[in-house]
Amino acid sequence: MADHRLVAVILEVSDLDSSVALYRDAFGLDLHPGNNAVDDRWTGGSHAEISWTEGAYLHFSLYPAKEQPTSGVQISLSVDNIESAHAAAVSACARVLHEPRNELWGRSGRYADFDGNVIELTQHT
């Protein structure tokens, strides 16, 4: 059987600059500007991106929405300290869906971006 792996998450957002600032300040993702000079509805044009190459490769991008922004997606980020991560999210004006609480896998808080996507911050125990 083929080894299929998730390698990219791409969200279309209503305001790229504001979203880049939120993901940086609230969630610690240092997105870098990118510009793919291709005529492709999904991957062409200006955007912001970050890739993790240690362990399994994963790429995350924000693109300006060409029609409706992506919504209803949940991504989860592992953090070392949920309380300080929560404080950073609140300080950056992320909308708190629920404050850090005990879950089966550790402590998690959930937040929404400007387009309604959910960002879970989790400290695994």
Question: Where on the chain are the PLM-derived regions?
Answer:
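Eukaryotic phosphotyrosine signaling hubs
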Residues: 6-8, 72-74
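Vicinal oxygen chelate
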Residues: 2, 8, 86-125
